[in-house]
Amino acid sequence: MKRLLLCLLLLVSASGARAESMVVIVRHAEKTSGESDDPPLSDAGRARAETLSRMLRDSEISAIFTTEFKRTKETAAPTAIALKITPTVVRATEIATLADKLRELHGNALVVAHGNTIPDLIKTLGIDVPLNIPENDYDHFLIVAVGSQPRLLRWRYP
């Protein structure tokens, strides 16, 4: 799976103009159900976060961005620990701020966000394609080549 991810990153970077950075964007993993406005990850969510970490171990991620919510921080945590990166927290409502940070970045990044904010982030990064992430869908794995000609690669992960 790691080799496939590396091939996908190379494919996106090789097509068209050279990208300044590759941004992996995922929705937070499965959360617990309940009445909390800020629920933690469920057991399935923690397992998915570990899978994400294994997938990104050799991807040369140099920055990680999460929102202020537990579920995004917990999804990013295994990757952050494995890569020894302190995640940057950006408020979920500050899509333009996050997009600016990603455009300024010279390296690969992981963004863990929310199903209702990812479509706006993709659009703000220059990708104008319809994207809908249903409430019960946690397996979208998006790679955006950020540069003069932004490109999007959609994938699903276990």
Short names for language-model regions:
Residues 20-106, 118-132, 136-158:
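Active-site-proximal alpha-helix that buttresses catalytic centers in soluble enzyme cores
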Residues 13-14, 39:
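Single-residue recognition of alpha-helix boundary sites
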